Amino acid sequence: MSLVVRPMRDDESRSFLEIQRAAVRGLAAKDYPASVIDAWAPLPVTDTAVAFFRVNHDSEIRLVAELDGELVGIGALVLAESELRACYVVPDAARRGVGSALVAEIERLARHHRLTHLELLSSLTAEPFYRALDYEVEERVEHVLGSGGRMPAVKMRKTLHQGAALGG
């Protein structure tokens, strides 16, 4: 098994969104009603959605994960907000170390940029994953989706310790 985490290329915007939607629909559907899933991960991925996604590209460091040459995961870091913005893995690659590798690279980048902590808004589905990576629950909240719908979510935080991860 060959796992590579790398910066997203400009021509991978649609794939980034498709992975997010596949992860939400395949993994989070057990924890949320269909109305939330449809608002959170609308299909198909439209040209308008891709264009909107590209507008925000300067504010995020976006990563992709390749497993044996196939894109299977995505991640995003917003330095200005010390926020782990996204970590999604397609269902077929779940529980194979892809998400952990994405978070490790996001944390490495955050340390490199001298961030002292990371915050995130987790789905109910991903909360145990982040807990296993030493993120702590700050509070349970209702996240307002772009459609105006609401979904239960978990605000989490992790203190980052500077060290060997400061390289490259």
Report the location of each language-model feature.
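Terminal substrate-recognition subdomain of acyl/acetyltransferases
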Residues: 149-168
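Conserved short alpha-helix immediately C-terminal to the canonical SAM/SAH-binding motif I
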Residues: 102, 126-129
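Extreme N-terminal starter segment of soluble prokaryotic enzymes
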Residues: 2-4
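Glycine-rich ATP-binding loop(s) of histidine-kinase-like ATPases
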Residues: 94-96
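Conserved catalytic-core motifs of GNAT/GCN5-like acyltransferases
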Residues: 119-121, 136-155
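Conserved GNAT acetyl-CoA-binding A-motif
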Residues: 110-123
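Acetyl-CoA-dependent GNAT
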Residues: 7-11, 18-92, 103-105, 109, ...
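Conserved active-site tyrosine of GNAT-family acetyltransferases
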Residues: 130, 135
